[in-house]
Design a protein with these regions (language model features):
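Conserved alpha-helical segments that form or flank metal/cofactor-binding pockets of metalloenzymes
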Residues: 185
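Amphipathic alpha-helical interaction segments
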Residues: 90, 94, 179-182, 226, ...
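Cell-wall glycan-active module
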Residues: 1-165, 251, 259-296
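Extracellular/periplasmic catalytic domains that process cell-envelope and extracellular macromolecules
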Residues: 169-173, 197, 290-291
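Alpha-helical segment that forms one wall of the substrate-binding/catalytic cleft
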Residues: 150, 154-169, 175, 188, ...
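Surface-exposed patches in mature extracellular/periplasmic domains of secreted proteins
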Residues: 106-111, 171-179, 192, 236-247, ...
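Extracytoplasmic ligand-binding site segments that recognize negatively charged/polar headgroups
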Residues: 195-201
Length: 296
């Protein structure tokens, strides 16, 4: 179907060749080797008067023990149905940053994962592996993407319904559609054409869309259906690895999407966390958060 991986992953991580452009919002370097440690031990929806406010955005800890505490806290919170709204968003963001920290400082990996409780170890290992795989596909550059806009995603419940509807229609597991959506555009947050010409929330080349698409390439629902149709035509659900490789010809991409998908298949509540993940751009200055409003 597709383009080289550098132009496809909406880059969640980095750039291929982009020109610098002054953003219209304030940008923050969030993950860097010198970042200070902030530990969130338990979900705390409403801090008491006089309590130290939690950082926004969250900050991943720099040492292994504190990072493990953050990771467990975030993984527990996103699976807790009583954690909603701004608290869910914050803990989902923290979850993302803990894995980005591991990918950026792999020497912490074994110590951190060894501290995961047994019920979280499989998911934590999968998330760590997927983040490392995606990070390995890109090379940091000095500039930010000039052709991107960052927007609010469609509501969590709406996207979940689109994935389930596409699964019912084409037989492709909903979790794989959600994982592709996550990797390609952070579930629709990134708007803009990739360096290889891919468009829309599921990043279709126009020629492929002409064959498999129906409706609006920029519609979450329509592009999710098209992705399911394309995957089905290439072996899904019986041979998901082949279907994913045809979607994007990188074994790292296949492994990463599969890892996220299988975490959600094993525990659908994991989707609540992934939905909160934000758009980061890996540069020579570090990880840059591109917030909603960037590029407008």
């Amino acid at each position: 179907m597709r383009r080289p991986i550098c132009g496809a992953i909406a880059l969640l991580l980095s750039a291929c060749t982009v020109s610098s452009a002054p953003p219209s919002v304030t940008l923050t370097v969030v993950v860097s080797p010198s970042a200070s440690a902030i530990v969130a031990a338990t979900p705390t929806p409403s801090p008491s008067p006089g309590a130290t406010p939690r950082p926004d955005p969250p900050v991943a800890a720099a040492d292994a023990d504190a990072l493990a505490v953050q990771m467990v806290s975030a993984e527990r919170a996103v699976r807790d149905q009583s954690v909603t709204g701004a608290d869910l968003a914050w803990f989902g963001h923290l979850q993302q940053l803990t894995y980005r920290r591991l990918a950026a400082t792999p020497e912490l990996r074994d110590t951190v994962l060894a501290e995961m409780p047994s019920d979280l170890k499989t998911a934590a290992t999968a998330n760590a592996d997927a983040t490392a795989d995606l990070r390995a596909t890109v090379v940091p550059g000095p500039d930010l993407p000039s052709a991107w806009r960052i927007v609010e995603p469609a509501p969590l419940e709406d996207l979940a319904r689109y994935y389930r509807e596409a699964e019912a229609e084409f037989g492709v597991p909903w979790s794989y559609l959600a994982a592709i959506h996550l990797v390609e555009t952070r579930m629709g947050r990134i708007r803009g054409t990739s360096t290889a010409g891919a468009q829309g929330p599921m990043q279709f080349i126009p020629a492929t869309w002409a064959r498999y698409g129906d409706g609006d390439i920029n519609s979450d629902r329509d592009s999710i259906r098209a992705a399911a149709r394309y995957l089905r035509a290439n072996g899904a659900p019986a041979n998901m690895a082949n279907a994913l490789f045809r979607y994007n010809q990188s074994q790292r991409y296949v492994r990463a999407v599969t890892a996220y998908a299988e975490v959600m298949r094993a525990d659908p509540d994991a989707y609540r966390g992934y939905y909160q993940w934000q758009v980061y751009y890996l540069t020579t200055r570090g990880d840059i958060l591109l917030p909603v409003g960037y590029g407008r």
